[in-house]
Curated annotation (Swiss-Prot):
Pathway(s): Carbohydrate degradation; glycolysis; pyruvate from D-glyceraldehyde 3-phosphate: step 1/5
GO biological process, one term: glucose metabolic process
Protein source organism: Mesembryanthemum crystallinum
Protein name as it appears in the record: Glyceraldehyde-3-phosphate dehydrogenase, cytosolic
Keyword Amino-acid biosynthesis among record annotations: no
Complex formation: Homotetramer.
Additional information: Plants contain two types of GAPDH: cytosolic forms which participate in glycolysis and chloroplast forms which participate in photosynthesis. All the forms are encoded by distinct genes.
SMART domains assigned to the protein according to its UniProt record, in alphabetical order: Gp_dh_N
InterPro entries: GlycerAld/Erythrose_P_DH, GlycerAld_3-P_DH_AS, GlycerAld_3-P_DH_cat, GlycerAld_3-P_DH_NAD(P)-bd, Glyceraldehyde-3-P_DH_1, NAD(P)-bd_dom_sf
Keywords of this entry: Cytoplasm, Glycolysis, NAD, Oxidoreductase
Disulfide-bond pairs as recorded: none
């Protein structure tokens, strides 16, 4: 079977890790990268060395020329276009484009990639109008005529599988989510201007920063049965990677915490294997760096007040786990054509 050919627009945190994921698989192939702000030699350096995930040792990366990188012996075209319409994806053979700039997140803007020859676009961020899919939750609803889709957010990818299990087994009446989230590139290294979010302008490495998130509400888009039943907020904390969701819910069907744990464990070993994890080990955030799964339920960290009110805790590598799901979604879509 021919490999699925993928291009990446935006070689930031997610773009580079999606590239690493693709290069580790044998069912897809990286054929092009576009980033107008990074020179080809700097791309080589940024891909090879990573402060969180370590040096990339699976593929030797070399600079062939100003417009080509070599991953092992595989050439990857490099473009530097600011306007997505101008990126020659078709010329490079890219059927799928991962839109990971964080800029072109609505359908109209992302559609510009189609003019350059791409057939499908997967946005690696939430979108206000593109249909959102979470692998393990609603990817089966994808229809082949959808050319632009969103992989939702890393937090929605963590929360949705857990919420699905709880709602399917016990019914969710209502719930609140808090994500304790690692700092990201949009935050400030020292206090600086942030007119839309004053707290967000404070130094990331020195503060716990309350923040907004649409991740819980977005679950209602991928699981319509939960629409209006969940909302949430975030705390940005001074760690570089791995975040954790606290989901506190009131459930319809009374169940002990042991019964809830058993249900999650069963699903993690069944239909959601590889997506939802389960652990009873005494783990901390760094233990999940590089974890492929979207959501790893921490059985020892949760508590219940009574048989209808429970707090559930689930970890996620907000970089690596999410990037893995981006590629999984691409492969699912490729099989629906």
């Amino acid at each position: 079977m021919a490999k699925v050919k993928v291009g990446i627009n935006g070689f930031g945190r997610i773009g580079r890790l999606v590239a690493r994921v693709i290069l580790q698989r044998d069912d897809c192939e990286l054929v092009a990268v576009n980033d107008p702000f990074i020179s080809t030699d700097y791309m080589t350096y940024m891909f090879k060395y990573d402060s969180v995930h370590g040096q990339c040792k699976s593929h030797e990366i070399k600079l062939k020329d100003e417009k080509t990188l070599l991953f092992g012996e595989t050439p990857v075209a490099v473009f530097g276009c600011r306007n997505p319409e101008e990126i020659p994806w078709g010329q490079a053979g890219a059927d799928f484009v991962v839109e990971s700039t964080g800029v072109f997140t609505d359908k109209d803007k992302a559609a510009a990639h189609l003019k350059g020859g791409a057939k499908k676009v997967v946005i690696s961020a939430p979108s206000k109008d593109a249909p959102m899919f979470v692998v393990g939750v609603n990817e089966h609803e994808y229809k082949s005529d959808l050319n632009i889709v969103s992989n939702a957010s890393c937090t929605t990818n963590c929360l949705a599988p857990l919420a699905k299990v709880i709602n399917d087994r016990f019914g969710i009446v209502e719930g609140l989510m808090t994500t304790v989230h690692a700092m990201t590139a949009t935050q400030k290294t020292v206090d600086g201007p942030s007119m839309k979010d004053w707290r967000g302008g404070r130094a990331a490495s020195f503060n716990i920063i309350p923040s907004s998130t649409g991740a819980a509400k977005a679950v209602g888009k991928v699981l319509p049965a939960l629409n209006g039943k969940l909302t949430g907020m975030a705390f940005r904390v001074p760690t570089c990677d791995v975040s954790v969701v606290d989901l506190t819910v009131r459930i319809e069907k009374a169940a002990s915490y042991e019964q809830i744990k058993a249900a999650i464990k069963e699903e993690s070993e069944g239909k959601l294997k590889g997506i939802l994890g389960y652990t009873e080990d005494d783990l901390v955030s760094t233990d999940f760096i590089g974890d492929n799964r979207s959501s790893i339920f921490d059985a020892k960290a949760g508590i219940s007040l009574n048989d209808n009110f429970v707090k559930l805790v689930s970890w996620y590598d907000n970089e690596w786990g999410y990037s893995t799901r981006v590629v999984d979604l691409i492969m699912h879509i490729s099989k629906c054509q």
